[in-house]
Structure formats: structure tokens, C-alpha cells
A protein has these predicted regions:
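Conserved short alpha-helical interface segments
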Residues: 1-4, 37-39
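Acidic/histidine-rich, metal-coordinating catalytic segments
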Residues: 97, 109-126, 148, 153
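Short, aromatic/basic amphipathic alpha-helical patches
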Residues: 127-137
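RNase H-like polynucleotidyl transferase catalytic core
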Residues: 55-62, 138-157, 171
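The start of beta-strands in P-loop NTPase/AAA+ ATPase cores
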Residues: 30, 115-116, 141
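Mobile genetic element proteins and their domesticated derivatives, centered on retroelements
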Residues: 33-35, 71-72, 78, 97, ...
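Extended, low-complexity cationic-aromatic segments
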Residues: 9-99, 199-204
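C-terminal anion-handling pockets and recognition modules
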Residues: 28-29, 155-205
């Protein structure tokens, strides 16, 4: 992946993101990192403890099915917003934008701060349909990442945490069961991060 990167573009993007993170941590902007992932009905295999020489087996009957996860990570609040879908299309990404509207969009009586959405150049982010939806949200500034630089997108760590700590070594009998498990996992992850953030803020005060 690194061999295909434009090193200068990655360095410049990294510096811009560093400044944006400082603004978000100061409370001046809302900074969101967005991207997609997927969860499977078959087990996600993470690190596990076992006796030396033991043969660990996780049952995985039938054919694995997928659930698309389209998410936005709020850098300042450490909150993960996830839209779950059977598909990963522009219309699904627009559903994520609508969820972001709920939390960050202008609304009567709400004091809104500038919002920045960090995106890669994936096809559902750059489609005609998505670009039209983004144009309808002038309050949302897009920070485009350079190609082949997933390490700049902080949401990737959240996807790993979600799967490793809440979905690992489990088999789900249906997509519906998986969907419910992911919804619960996102709630738990946000609760944990919110508790840690409050604790850190009390220490800083």
C-alpha cells in the first residue's frame, strides 16, 4: 500500500489532520472520520489465550453472510455513529450523512460549530449522488484524504476495536442477530469511550 502512496500528499494531509484534531480537541470544530467496514455472521478471529499446543476451534456452520457498516467517528467526543445495511452503496452512505445531520446539522435552537468530515476517494464517496448530497450540506466541509492512505483515517482503529472486543469468536445464526449485536456493541463502545473521556477531563481539570 505504501508503495502506491504519494508520500508528499500523505505528509501534507497528516499535518492538516493534526491541526484539525487540535481544533476539535479545543472544541472549535466537530471533526468526523468516515469510512465503511463489514461484519460477518461467521466468527471474527482475534487474539485468544490457549494452552500451548491446544487446537482452538470456533464453529462456523453454513455460508457466511455480511452486514455493511458505514460509520463516522467524532474525534473530540470519541463517539461512533454507525449506519447498518445489507448493501454498501451511495444511498447507504447518504443514510449515514442523514444520521450525521441529526447530531451536527443546523437546527433551530441549536448552537452549531463548524463540522469537518474526513473521507477517502472511495466510489460511494465520490459518486454523482453522494456529491449532490454533500452539496446540500454547506455546513459540512470535506477533507479529502490522499489515495492509498488508510492509516490517516482514525475510524479504522474503531472498526478493529468493535470487532476484536465485541464480536470476536462468535457465530451469528442470521444477519438480523448480527445486526442486533453490532448495534449493542456500538452502544457499549461509545459508553466506554465516553466514560474514559469524562475521567480524562476531570483529571485535566
Amino acid at each position: 500500500m505504501r508503495g502506491r502512496q504519494d508520500g508528499d500528499a500523505v505528509d501534507r494531509a497528516g499535518l492538516r489532520l493534526k491541526l484539525l484534531k487540535q481544533q476539535a480537541e479545543a472544541g472549535d470544530i466537530a471533526l468526523l472520520f468516515a469510512d465503511e467496514s463489514e461484519a460477518l455472521t461467521h466468527p471474527y478471529l482475534a487474539h485468544a489465550w490457549a494452552k500451548r499446543g491446544a487446537d482452538l476451534r470456533v464453529p462456523a456452520p453454513g455460508q457466511s453472510r455480511k452486514l455493511a457498516l458505514l460509520g463516522g467517528l467524532d474525534h473530540g467526543a470519541a463517539r461512533l455513529i454507525v449506519h447498518r445495511s445489507r448493501t454498501k452503496r451511495s444511498t447507504d452512505f447518504i443514510s449515514l450523512l442523514e444520521a450525521i445531520d441529526t447530531h451536527y446539522g443546523p437546527r433551530p435552537g441549536r448552537v452549531s460549530k463548524p463540522a469537518v468530515l474526513v473521507l477517502d476517494n472511495g466510489p460511494i464517496h465520490t459518486s454523482k449522488l453522494t456529491r449532490a448530497a454533500l452539496a446540500q450540506r454547506p455546513w459540512l466541509t470535506i477533507e479529502w484524504l490522499p489515495k492509498y492512505a488508510p492509516e490517516l483515517n482514525d475510524i479504522e482503529r474503531s472498526w478493529r476495536d468493535l470487532k476484536r472486543h465485541f464480536l470476536a469468536h462468535q457465530t451469528f445464526s442470521s444477519v438480523e442477530q448480527l445486526d442486533a449485536a453490532v448495534a449493542l456493541a456500538v452502544d457499549h463502545l461509545n459508553h466506554e469511550r465516553g466514560s474514559h473521556l469524562c475521567h480524562d477531563q476531570r483529571i485535566a481539570a
